[in-house]
Amino acid sequence: MSLPEIARGSEHLVLFDDQTSEVVKVTLPGTYGDYYEIIDGRISQFDSTPAEYLLRMRWWEKLFSTAPDPLGLTESGQILSRQKFISGEPPQQEEVDQFLVEAGAEAVRQKCWLWKMADVDPESEIWIGDARSDNFVLAEGKIIPIDIRIWGVPIPTQGR
């Protein structure tokens, strides 16, 4: 079965399954997204591993209930996932920012689309990156994340 391509980004090829009204995401070869940390006051970017990519989906589902479902791997190690196609309009960035605040997030570097949530995990802050308006959709009066990056940043232990 051949599915039509509807988008291609820095991380995924996105195909549309007309029979199920779902998108199929295929990571680009050797690409599993990235994450950020602030080191010496500067944002530093790191490549994610396949395990971190899959963990992202778990956090995404726990926090927002809209994550893609992982399906498996291609022979070349690309991760396949399915996600319900959500029809809607692109929200304004201010609406996305307000959605994140209402979800319990606080801006780390808002102009860099970088947020965090404390009190979700006892050992880590959960960071949300790439929270740009084009990675969300406004449908039925709700903001829905459709392509975000989520990772844990360990909480420093006091007294070390």
Residue ranges and their predicted role:
Residues 26-29, 113-160:
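Catalytic activation segment of kinase domains across protein kinase-like and atypical kinase folds
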Residues 2-61:
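ATP-binding glycine-rich loop module of kinase domains
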Residues 16-17, 75, 131, 138:
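Generic beta-strand structural signal
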